């Protein structure tokens, strides 16, 4: 049975070698300096099944976190959902947020973009740039990220039906600017089943829509390995009337 001191000597030490602890005082409101880890061992209980049931931070099954030192080393990425009007306007907003200390970007697209329509399509009238940024072309995507280092920030894009096309535009912009795809980090929502059940922003029938999602799963890890190819959105399904069990499923 592995003990707490084993984890500190092995996993935690290796984690700190990669990302040292943040230069702040890790103390509670009662001015207590907490240990990097607490287990049943701290109250005198040696549970032989603990490692299998809960595990340790940075180790399978990752119940206690995917990194050994977790937020002692690096806080979670903080990104405000942002996007409105034109690509120029949203680019200006992105730069303002990054200057203020934001550590990632989260792109809000307008309804025509979410539905796969160009801004000049008749059905787009009155909706262009209203609830997010309008992106109809590669040129729009270039403007959207002009002056932003795509290897230094991660980008989350709340896009589903046209996710593969929008992501392709993003990667094309990165390639044109000379960035290495293997260093790019980010997320595409890409949860098309949520669209059919809840949000209703779908373009194609379920079967070909799911096939497009699968295509990103197959191609992505080989070419953009640090990217998250789906963000499952159970929240929307619950808001549309599902039970908690259906949301989880």
Spans of features found by a protein language model:
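Catalytic alpha/beta active-site cores
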Residues: 1-249
């Amino acid at each position: 049975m592995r003990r707490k001191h084993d984890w500190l000597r092995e996993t935690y030490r290796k984690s700190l070698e990669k990302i040292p602890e943040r230069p702040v005082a890790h103390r509670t409101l009662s001015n207590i300096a907490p240990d990097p880890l607490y287990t049943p061992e701290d109250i005198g209980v040696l549970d032989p099944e603990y490692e299998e049931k809960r595990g340790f931070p940075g180790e399978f099954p990752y119940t206690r976190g995917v990194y050994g030192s977790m937020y002692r080393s690096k806080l979670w990425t903080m990104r405000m959902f942002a996007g409105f009007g034109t690509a120029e306007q949203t680019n200006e907003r992105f730069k303002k947020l990054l200057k203020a200390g934001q550590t990632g970007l989260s792109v809000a697209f307008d309804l025509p973009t979410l539905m796969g329509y160009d801004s000049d399509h008749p059905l787009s009238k009155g909706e262009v740039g209203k609830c997010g940024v309008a992106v109809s072309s590669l040129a729009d995507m270039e403007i959207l990220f002009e002056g932003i280092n795509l290897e230094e920030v991660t980008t989350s894009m709340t896009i589903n039906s046209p996710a593969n096309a929008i992501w392709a535009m993003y990667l094309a912009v990165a390639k044109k600017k000379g960035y290495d795809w293997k260093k790019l980090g980010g997320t595409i929502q890409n949860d098309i089943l949520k669209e059919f059940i809840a949000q209703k922003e779908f373009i194609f029938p379920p079967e070909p829509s799911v096939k497009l999602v699968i295509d990103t799963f197959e191609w992505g890890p080989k070419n953009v390995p640090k990217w998250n190819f789906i963000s499952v959105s159970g929240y929307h399904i619950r808001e549309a009337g599902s039970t908690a069990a259906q949301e989880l499923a």
